[in-house]
Design a protein with these regions (language model features):
Chain A
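Short, non-transmembrane amphipathic alpha-helical segments
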Residues: 54-79
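Residue-level signature of catalytic and energy-coupling elements of molecular machines
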Residues: 16, 35, 58, 80
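Short edge beta-strands and adjacent turn/loop segments
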Residues: 26-52
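N-terminal presequence-like segments and adjacent domain-start helices
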Residues: 1-18
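A short amphipathic beta-strand at an alpha->beta junction
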Residues: 70-94
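Short secondary-structure junctions
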Residues: 19-32, 75-77, 137-141
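Cys/His-clustered metal-coordination modules, chiefly Zn-binding fingers
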Residues: 98-173
Length: 173, 300
């Protein structure tokens, strides 16, 4: 619905904030941390949104672009540009606190913190990480990694040995 | 349904008519890959060299991705099929960016699709390790991926500071992705190498089989010499010690023996980086380019 009364920048922010991730729809793109900027231009007629991909090959970015265009058109913007930038690379540290809570509520274990990247070579990890990933269903810390690669680019598969439920875990990058 | 409408799932967009906007690489609805692609060529860098170097890094990823995708519906376990497909997808994403950058700087009117699907074999710049394939032998997939990703990770690590903004950005994302690929392969090498007598025998045989293609990974081409001096590229000869030390750590844990086999050599000093390939690349391109060549301009 076009709401001409609210300032364009507020309308644009609100429209962008409501768009959800196509693969993990409990998260908004804001929660996921992929929205890098929303700029209103041309006296409020045009808007430019800048987003960044999670993984290099993640096909969801195309749906995100589509959904952002639709949401901003519905918010009354005549010209919508969605740009993709690669640098700096996305990190799971950019997932918001609300996003982490929503993931857990929907049965997906949120990522642990990564922190700043060290500059040396990435150390070889010959066994699965020992970090405690709590089961999002029963809260037990007794969980195993089944596979590093899950149904989407950003998740791994795990299993809880206490409640025996399998679950996805957003792996840290 | 128009392209501007939202979709219930990522796959709904496949059924739409995208008119002139469709592309091959990922199928329908794919647009310009990133804003950085059109950055100017850094000062003092020959655009032709930069285009060639982007093709080297991009073709390694594209052809390796295609070979990994051959495991889809063929892997021994569903989890491994998903893993190999995920790894292929990461590499395809890296390839798209690098081919788009090559197309932009060469200024010959070729986009990423033209470079991937309409380029003849002699213009491909990938190393043989990417093209030789796995022959549906899972141990061979593990060996090839271990060697390829350990090497690529060391390259990307140094390319983080490349003066070319696209190469640096691809490296920034790629380091995180390829570290996962390497660790996946290293863990399987450990599990098979230090497993049963039969799994050990097959893992060692697979490693021996792909070893002749290792030497080429560290051979420096003229383009790499020029672009290393310009602060854009990495001299692959310089990363050998680091790659060897990672491989030795894996081999020791996995009770595998470092093969003593000669490399495949060159023809008058030329190899994959100069467009001379094994017969395997022809097989890859026949499959990968077949549809695009039989139906020129078709989109889906």
């Amino acid at each position: 619905m076009v709401n001409g009364a609210a300032p364009a920048a507020v309308r644009a922010q609100a429209a962008v904030a409501a768009v959800v991730d196509p693969e993990m729809p409990m998260l908004t793109l804001d929660d996921l941390g992929v929205v890098r900027g929303v700029e209103v231009r041309a006296g409020g007629e045009a808007v430019r949104v800048t987003i960044t991909p999670t993984y290099s090959g993640c096909p969801a970015i195309e749906v995100m672009r589509d959904d952002l265009r639709t949401a901003l058109a519905e918010a009354g913007f005549a010209a919508v540009e969605v740009r993709t930038v690669l640098s700096p690379p996305w990190s799971t540290d950019w997932i918001s606190a609300a996003g982490r809570r929503k993931l857990a509520e929907h049965g997906i274990a949120p990522p642990a913190g990564v922190g700043p990247r060290s500059s040396g070579p990435v150390p070889l990890a010959l066994s699965a990480p020992v970090d405690v990933v709590r089961c999002p269903h029963c809260g037990s810390a007794a969980t195993d990694e089944l596979s590093r690669f899950g149904p989407t680019a950003c998740t791994a598969l795990r299993r809880c040995t206490a409640c025996r439920e399998p679950f996805e875990h957003v792996k840290e990058i | 349904m128009s392209a501007s409408e939202s979709h219930d799932t990522a796959y709904d967009s496949l059924t739409e008519d995208h008119g002139a906007d469709g592309q091959w690489a990922f199928g329908t609805g794919i647009e310009d890959v990133a804003a950085e692609i059109t950055s100017p060529v850094p000062d003092g860098v020959d655009p032709a060299d930069l285009a060639q170097y982007c093709l080297m890094l991009g073709d390694d990823a594209l052809i390796c991705s295609h070979r990994l995708s051959e495991w889809t519906t063929n892997a021994p376990e569903l989890e491994e099929e998903v893993a190999l497909a995920n790894i292929a997808l990461d590499l395809l994403g890296q390839a798209r960016l690098l081919l788009a950058r090559a197309g932009h700087v060469e200024q010959a009117g070729r986009d990423e699709d033209a470079l991937a699907y309409l380029r003849p074999e002699l213009e491909f710049r990938n190393v043989a390790m990417a093209e030789i394939g796995d022959e549906l032998d899972f141990a061979r997939a593990v060996a090839r991926l271990l060697l390829f990703s350990t090497w690529r990770l060391a390259l990307l690590q140094r390319l983080l500071t490349s003066r070319d903004p696209v190469i640096a950005a691809v490296a920034g994302k790629g380091v995180k992705e390829v570290a996962y690929h390497r660790d996946y392969a290293a863990r399987w090498a450990l599990r098979l190498g230090d497993g049963t007598a039969e799994s050990h025998r097959r893992m060692q045989a697979a490693l021996d089989g792909v070893w002749p293609y290792v030497e080429e990974l560290f051979r420096t081409s003229e383009v790499e010499v020029a672009l290393t001096a310009a602060g854009v590229a990495v001299d692959p000869a310089q990363i050998r010690a680091e790659v060897d030390s990672v491989l030795d750590e894996v081999f020791a844990a996995a009770t595998l023996t470092r093969p003593q086999r000669p490399g495949i050599g060159t023809i008058a000093g030329r190899g994959g980086r100069q467009g001379l390939h094994t017969e395997k690349l022809g097989h890859v391109l026949a499959v990968m380019q077949g549809l695009a060549r039989q139906h020129p301009g078709a989109t889906w």
